[in-house]
A protein has these predicted regions:
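Ubiquitin-like/PB1-type beta-grasp interaction modules and other compact soluble beta-rich domains
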Residues: 1-88
């Protein structure tokens, strides 16, 4: 199963890309995608705790433009977006 994770905001800077392509053998939950992103950060940016915190605090959005929680199941090839928290006034 192929999952395309579209990246926005600071996530684009962390991964130096606008999307990541992840492969899995079976259906996964958003929580699994979040954990995989954190695992990648631990390898590439092991000393930067703020990057991991950003992923933990980010929301995920389905292809139907709905915010989905960590228990949302991805059953087949899908596109999902990660939306980091933003600041401003």
């Amino acid at each position: 199963m192929k999952i395309k994770v579209k990246l926005f905001g600071n996530c684009k800077d962390i991964f130096k890309n606008s999307a990541l392509h992840l492969n899995f053998n079976k259906k996964k939950k958003v929580k699994d995608i979040r954990n995989k992103l954190i695992e990648i950060i631990e390898i590439k940016h092991s000393t930067n705790k703020s990057y991991k915190d950003l992923i933990k605090k980010s929301a995920f959005c389905s292809e139907q433009d709905e915010i989905v929680n960590d228990s949302y199941v991805l059953k087949k090839d899908k596109i999902i977006s990660i939306i980091p928290p933003i600041g401003g006034g």
